Design a protein with these regions (language model features):
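Flexible, acidic/Gly-rich N-terminal and inter-domain linker regions that tether
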Residues: 1-67
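Catalytic cores of large soluble enzymes that bind and process phosphate-bearing ligands
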Residues: 14, 18, 82, 115
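Fold-independent oxyanion-binding glycine-rich loops
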Residues: 41, 47, 62-63, 75, ...
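Residues that scaffold the ATP/ADP-binding catalytic core of kinase and kinase-like folds
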Residues: 47, 68, 72, 171-174
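Iron-sulfur (Fe-S) cluster-binding segments and ferredoxin-like electron-carrier domains
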Residues: 48-59, 71-89
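N-terminal small/glycine-rich loop or linker at the start of catalytic domains
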Residues: 64-72, 193-199
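Conserved AdoMet/S-adenosylmethionine-binding subsite of the radical SAM
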Residues: 86-96, 100-102, 106-239
Length: 239
């Protein structure tokens, strides 16, 4: 950490976005409903593959985040007001895409009194109303550790609630803006204690050691996390 120089990617790592029929249709549905996805906001290198298969991770509560985590490419600043039609638009898009499993995430909304919790809950309820056979996985922010706000999401009853630890304890303060390692563990504990499947994710490639990753995994097990994803950090390019 601490080196801002962008590293040129090897040719074998580069992929073509592609533009098959499913990709074009997914793009049309997302844009026609004025929705955001973490795929495009985060400049995800897998967007072509996922959209080409008709899947996308919807990002609610706008596309401007109140935090500025160093690993993330999502825009930071003063967000716009919430769109009251967004929950319905997300649910309609999921129906049009015929998704059997929907994944939703959001920017952080530290500017709102409830940090976006009610909007989260309404989105989940609308998805379930319009898509009763679709399972719902939500990747939530920490809501500043406020249990009553996390409980609003829990009571909407998604099948999986995920909150990413992102990295190991030592590196967390350097890359996670306004987040806290132990607060995140308590968020996951609250999810697990509710009976909903608790999930988390981390990146490797930030300077962590194998022992530190094992320590993090032990911490997650201790609070009841059932699913962990581990990905390789790839720095977004400017274009």
């Amino acid at each position: 950490m601490g080196n801002d120089k962008r590293v040129r990617k090897p040719e074998w790592l580069k992929i073509s976005i592609g533009a098959n029929e499913r990709y074009t249709e997914t793009k049309r549905i997302v844009e026609s409903h004025c929705l955001h996805t973490i795929c495009s906001s985060g400049r995800c290198p897998n967007m072509g593959e996922c959209w080409g298969k008709g899947t996308a991770t919807f990002m609610i509560a706008g596309d401007i985040c109140t935090r500025s985590c160093k690993f993330c490419n999502t825009q930071t600043g003063r967000p716009l007001p919430l769109d009251p039609d967004e929950p319905a638009h997300v649910a309609e898009s999921i129906a049009l895409m015929k998704l059997s499993h929907a994944v939703i995430t959001s920017v952080d909304r530290d500017d709102l009194p409830d940090l976006g919790a009610a909007h989260w809950a309404q989105t989940i309820r609308e998805i379930k109303r319009l898509n009763p056979e679709t399972t719902t996985e939500v990747l939530i922010p920490d809501f500043q550790g406020r249990k009553e706000l996390i409980d609003q999401v829990i009571k909407a009853c998604p099948e999986i609630i995920s909150h990413n630890m992102e990295t190991v304890k030592r590196i967390s303060p350097q890359v996670r803006s306004a987040a806290n390692y132990h607060t995140s563990l308590e968020v996951i504990r609250q999810i697990a204690e509710s009976g909903i499947t608790a999930k988390s994710g981390i990146m490797v490639g930030l300077g962590e050691t194998p022992a530190e990753v094992e320590e993090l995994m032990d911490d997650l097990i201790s609070v009841g996390c059932k699913i962990l994803t581990i990905g390789q950090y790839l720095q977004p390019t400017h274009k």
